[in-house]
């Protein structure tokens, strides 16, 4: 038997041995520490692994076990999932690859042809797949949702979410909830009208759609000036969270359009820059909380929600915590959406604070003007889409934080909208003498107080990841992959990957050994303890 045939037979055996991922397995993902079954590791958005074979005492013995270079030259923003020893990862724009999680040996690759006229704001990227049963689900930059056979990469169904020619795309990893695939969309910079969709996992038929901008006559439409709601943005371009006990999906919404010009869309612009809580079965709105009303700065609420059950002021509460792009850390009751507290975690000059009702107190002098106004944080925010992590052991939230400013200048005159074209209302610039700084920060989960921080040379675009070994893993723009003591931020280990890190690490176990995988540059790097 030749080598290639042997490899093919072994691959077929490994793929066949991988178990079906039921909804019950997803509900109990924490009980399967050897797998990484969802984008955030669990429905609560924790990015926490219960594995502790790799820990503070032996992390210096980490070494690279394998690397896999993608064919795409674009940076990876994917979060791989791992199911029973099989890793599934995406590469730009919309390829999926199945790998042996122990060796990096590829099993199959799905390659999708993307139309030449696809336009996206910030790169033709993809952040991952979702699995249910033996099917993988992926959104595409030409605004489709695709179901693939996890054993072969064969297309099972392919449905259009919406018309990409109007500026829509799907870049986020979907979220499986019961028998539905929840899909958000990108395109806020094109003046789209945002929505969140649910699709039947078996057939691909759409089950419900929630528009993040209320239509004419609907509650909330009065928060938009005239017809500005029709091109108001509020996309849903980062994966959300789910509470099965409450049957609520929590999802962040993006900035109102056009960017950097609030005067032509006067009002709060609901439900932009918000967290929305939707009934998982119907898509009906249960509650919302808006972080930045009438946003003139482009501060999407594009962060993964973190759900925490904790005692708050002497009472057990179901909480949702959020380190927002606007530089404030929020604690809300996730049953009702009640605002509980907020604290700035990065330098900010735009607000005098958050009032007792949870509404920001804008500083009038910080509103953008045609002459330009210097405001902290800058247009990309105090943090961005890259995921935070939460450890139930330390009760800390770990966030990649930026400290910098932009000069905001809105355009004057008419701003006509053309479907499929960029819809900008101004321009932000960075002061030459102040490029800004960055850090990994550990925040108290209930107050947002900074407990420790580790400075970075540049504004890193990677998320954090934490383990039961009390290690926080993080990568930066220089390609350094680092492990910190989760309690005090001490740097314990560092390796160079040679590529910009623009994603988060994950951990899993195969044949009794723990591994850590990091997407960096256009490659996957996997580390384990030296044998």
Language-model segment annotations:
Residues 309, 402, 432-490:
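Loop/turn-rich, solvent-exposed surfaces of beta-rich toroidal or solenoidal domains
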Residues 503-531:
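Blade-level signature of beta-propeller repeat domains, shared across WD40, Kelch, NHL, RCC1
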């Amino acid at each position: 038997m030749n080598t290639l045939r042997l490899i093919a037979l072994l691959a077929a055996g490994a793929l066949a041995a991988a178990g079906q991922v039921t909804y019950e397995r997803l509900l109990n993902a924490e009980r399967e520490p050897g797998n990484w079954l969802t984008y955030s590791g669990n429905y609560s958005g924790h990015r926490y692994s219960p594995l502790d074979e790799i820990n503070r005492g032996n992390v210096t013995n980490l070494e690279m076990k394998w690397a896999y270079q993608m064919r795409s030259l674009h940076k990876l923003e994917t979060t791989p999932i791992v199911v029973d020893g099989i890793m599934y990862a995406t590469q730009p724009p919309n390829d999926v690859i199945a790998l042996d999680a122990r060796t990096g040996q590829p099993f199959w690759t799905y390659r999708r042809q993307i139309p030449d006229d696809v336009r996206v704001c910030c790169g033709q990227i993809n952040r991952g797949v979702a699995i249910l049963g033996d099917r993988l689900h992926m959104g595409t930059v030409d605004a489709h949702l695709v179901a693939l056979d996890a054993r072969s990469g064969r297309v099972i169904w392919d449905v259009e979410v919406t018309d990409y020619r109007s500026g829509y795309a799907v870049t986020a990893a979907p979220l499986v909830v019961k028998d539905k695939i929840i899909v958000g969309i990108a395109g806020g910079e094109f003046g789209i009208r945002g929505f969140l969709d649910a699709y039947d996992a078996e057939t691909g038929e759409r089950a419900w759609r929630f528009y993040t901008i209320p239509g004419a006559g609907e509650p909330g439409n009065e928060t938009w000036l005239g017809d500005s709601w029709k091109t108001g943005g509020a996309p849903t371009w980062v994966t959300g969270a789910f509470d099965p006990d409450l049957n609520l999906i929590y999802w962040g919404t993006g900035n109102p359009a056009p960017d950097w010009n609030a005067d032509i869309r006067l009002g709060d612009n609901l439900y932009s820059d918000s967290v929305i809580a939707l009934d998982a079965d119907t898509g009906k709105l249960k509650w919302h909380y808006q972080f930045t009303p009438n946003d003139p700065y482009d501060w999407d609420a594009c962060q993964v929600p973190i759900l925490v059950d904790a005692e708050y002021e002497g009472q057990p509460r179901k909480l949702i915590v959020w380190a927002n792009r606007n530089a404030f850390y929020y604690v809300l009751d996730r049953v009702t959406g009640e605002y509980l507290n907020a604290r700035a975690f990065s330098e900010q000059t735009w607000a005098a604070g958050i009032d007792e009702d949870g509404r920001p107190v804008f500083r009038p002098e910080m509103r953008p003007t045609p002459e330009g106004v210097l405001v902290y944080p800058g247009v990309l925010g105090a943090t961005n889409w890259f995921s935070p992590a939460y450890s139930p052991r330390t009760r800390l939230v770990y966030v990649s934080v930026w400290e910098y400013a932009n000069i905001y200048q809105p355009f004057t005159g008419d701003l006509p909208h053309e479907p499929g074209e960029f819809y900008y209302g101004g321009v932000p610039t960075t002061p030459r003498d102040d490029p800004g700084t960055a850090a990994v920060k550990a925040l108290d989960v209930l107050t947002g107080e900074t407990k420790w921080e580790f400075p970075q040379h540049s504004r890193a675009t990677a998320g954090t990841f934490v383990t039961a070994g009390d290690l926080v893993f993080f990568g930066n723009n220089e390609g350094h992959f680092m492990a910190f003591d989760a309690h005090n931020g001490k740097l314990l280990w560092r390796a160079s990957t040679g590529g910009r890190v623009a994603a988060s690490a994950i951990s899993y176990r195969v044949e009794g050994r723990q591994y850590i995988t990091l997407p960096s540059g256009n490659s996957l790097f996997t580390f384990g303890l030296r044998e």
